[in-house]
Amino acid sequence: MICSSLLLATILLPTINSAQNAEHDHYVSPWKTPWTYEQAAHWSELDPDYAACNAGKQQSPIDIQQTEKSPLPALRFEYTSAPLKYVINNGHTIRVDYHDAPQSGSFLIVGDQRYQLTQFHFHRPSEEYLHGKPSDMVLHLMHKSAEGKVAGVAVLLKSGAANATVQQLWEHMPATEGQQAVSGVDLNPAAMLPRATGYYTYTGSQTAPPCSEGVTWFVLKTPVEISAAQITAFATLYPHDVRPVQPLNGRVVKESQ
């Protein structure tokens, strides 16, 4: 019991020295108008720039119920180990930023489209629902092509064995909102992917203001395990950082064969 408590304490304890010794330890929010998840139904009323949050017809996340099986291209994850720029507590989630291209060195290839990984972040529980149910958490890996197209990969996370890469991140996440830490570590995000990369795909949006549409989402069908203690560590900071599911409005969700 004592060992379990010590393990949980180690997971929950932020790396204070990392934040204090960071090159920049204060995060500058990109949102000119503050928002919260509790205000999700009223985001469009907070700022005209958030109008798509209510007026948009291709919003995310969604509840994946019915799918159309299609001969879709395989997802090629050309991820590599690279130094992280910041581990950020932005007041809504824990987000990891990469340096500008080509320094991240990690790419998603879908058919003839090439996207660079720009950042990733977490939600608890998952924003994506499968047949009416969320997963314990979700990892969102966000990518952008040279033409400016955005692609998000959702990796569902479920309680099970501890994930060493997630643990590495948790050891560097700032406990205080508005702080960012230069981690000084290399990390390969491929270690947070499942072996099987079959997926669901649809056209959606960012899941936070300004809710910009035109995002191609790939929701991986196979979940990845993280430990209950790792889920608790995140929940201590963000127990419920999710946007409610949005109407499909006639959109078709395709499923890889």
Model regions and ranges:
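Sec-dependent signal peptide recognition
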Residues: 1-8
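Hydrophobic h-region of N-terminal signal peptides that target proteins for export
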Residues: 9-17
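Alpha-carbonic anhydrase
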Residues: 4, 16-257
